[in-house]
C-alpha cells in the first residue's frame, strides 16, 4: 500500500537517462551555437542513490526521506543506516526489493535512495508517507 505510493512519488524524481542527458546537452549546444546566450539550467530535484551518497546526505541533514532495500546482500552495508537516521532525526523506511529501487535510478539494483528536495505539490504526499 504505502510502498506503491512511495514508488509513485519517487518516480517523479528519477534521474535523467543517458539519452535524455544527451538530448538536453545537444539542445543547449545548439542554442549556444545560435548565439542565444548560454543559460545554465536549474538543477531539478532528483533522487540520490547509493550508500555513500545517502550517508553523507543524512550526516549533513540534507535528506528528507531515506529508503532502504531489505535484501541487500552483505547486510552490513546498510545495517548502520537506520541508527544514523534516528540519531540525525531523518525519517527512513525499509522497502522490499533492491531491484525496485534500482529501476527508479536506471540501474539493476540499488541499496538505498534518498529524497533531498521535493516539489511543492508533492510535499503533502511525502509528509503522509513519513507519517505512515
From Swiss-Prot:
Keywords: Acetylation, Cytoplasm, Isopeptide bond, Ribonucleoprotein, Ribosomal protein, Ubl conjugation. It holds the Pfam family Ribosomal_L7Ae. There is a cross-link at residues 8, 36 (Glycyl lysine isopeptide (Lys-Gly) (interchain with G-Cter in SUMO2)). Gene3D superfamilies: 3.30.1330.30. PROSITE patterns: RIBOSOMAL_L7AE (PS01082). It is found in: Cytoplasm. GO terms for molecular function: RNA binding. Disulfide bonds: none annotated. One of its GO terms (cellular component) is cytosolic large ribosomal subunit. One of its GO terms (biological process) is maturation of LSU-rRNA. The modification N6-acetyllysine is found at residues 8, 128. Component of the large ribosomal subunit. The ribosome is a large ribonucleoprotein complex responsible for the synthesis of proteins in the cell. Belongs to the eukaryotic ribosomal protein eL8 family. Component of the large ribosomal subunit. Interacts with CRY1. Interacts with DICER1, AGO2, TARBP2, MOV10 and EIF6; they form a large RNA-induced silencing complex (RISC). This is Large ribosomal subunit protein eL8. It comes from Sus scrofa (Pig).
Amino acid at each position: 500500500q504505502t510502498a506503491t505510493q512511495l514508488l509513485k512519488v519517487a518516480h517523479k524524481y528519477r534521474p535523467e537517462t543517458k539519452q535524455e542527458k544527451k538530448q538536453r546537452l545537444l539542445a543547449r549546444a545548439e542554442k549556444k551555437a545560435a548565439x542565444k546566450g548560454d543559460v545554465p539550467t536549474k538543477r531539478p530535484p532528483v533522487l540520490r542513490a547509493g550508500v555513500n551518497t545517502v550517508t553523507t546526505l543524512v550526516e549533513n541533514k540534507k535528506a528528507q526521506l531515506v529508503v532502504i532495500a531489505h535484501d541487500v546482500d552483505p547486510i552490513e552495508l546498510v545495517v548502520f543506516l537506520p541508527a544514523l537516521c534516528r540519531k540525525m532525526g531523518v525519517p527512513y523506511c525499509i522497502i522490499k526489493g533492491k531491484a525496485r529501487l534500482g529501476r527508479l535510478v536506471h540501474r539493476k539494483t540499488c541499496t538505498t535512495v534518498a529524497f533531498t528536495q521535493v516539489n511543492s505539490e508533492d510535499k503533502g504526499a511525502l509528509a503522509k508517507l513519513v507519517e505512515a
